[in-house]
Design a protein with these regions (language model features):
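Conserved acetyl-CoA-binding loop-helix of GNAT-fold acetyltransferases
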Residues: 87, 93-106, 133
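Conserved beta-strand in the GNAT
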Residues: 55, 61-70
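Conserved beta-strand-loop-alpha-helix junction that forms the acyl-donor binding cleft
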Residues: 117-127, 144-148
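Conserved GNAT-fold acetyl-CoA-binding loop/helix
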Residues: 16-44
Length: 148
């Protein structure tokens, strides 16, 4: 496998690689199964709210997807938050996730971020092992109150 990272959006959230956005949908839906039928429309709203996307590609095929944002707050300073990180199930344990994480870390460092943060579902033990191998630590609990 010959991996490369393709930046799908620019720093303003504009889609600069629409063909790669379209190719990302299948892999992205393997993590986010409730995404609406209008995938491009949903992602346009995410990008308008500060989200960015890159994909890991093997040739012309998307094998991993990352959606992230850079923001500043009072408790973590300037940080990168990873909304979504997913690897094609057929390509797990082949360096795809590591390639995306290394790219995200470079982007975060170049932007002056103090942290790279993400949340992972409590049931995703394999993902947790991966994040620990990537040098991440648990620093807080994440609480959610459903509103409807």
């Amino acid at each position: 496998m010959s991996l490369r990272v393709v930046t799908v959006t620019d720093d303003r959230g504009a889609v600069v690689e629409p063909q790669w956005l379209a190719r990302a949908e299948g892999v992205h839906r393997s993590l986010r199964t409730a995404l609406p039928a209008d995938y491009a429309g949903k992602l346009a709203r995410v990008f308008a709210g500060g989200g960015r996307m890159c994909v890991a590609a093997d040739g012309e095929r998307v094998v991993g997807v990352a959606v992230y944002r850079i923001s500043e707050n009072t408790f973590a300073g300037l940080n990168m938050y990873v909304d979504d990180l997913v690897t094609d199930e057929r390509e797990r344990s082949r360096g795809v996730g590591h390639t995306l994480m290394a790219h995200l870390e470079r982007v975060a460092r170049d932007a002056g971020c103090e942290n790279l943060r993400l949340d992972s579902g409590t049931h995703r033990q394999q993902a947790h092992k991966f994040y620990f191998r990537e040098g991440m630590v648990i620093t807080s609990f994440s609480f959610t109150k459903p509103l409807g």
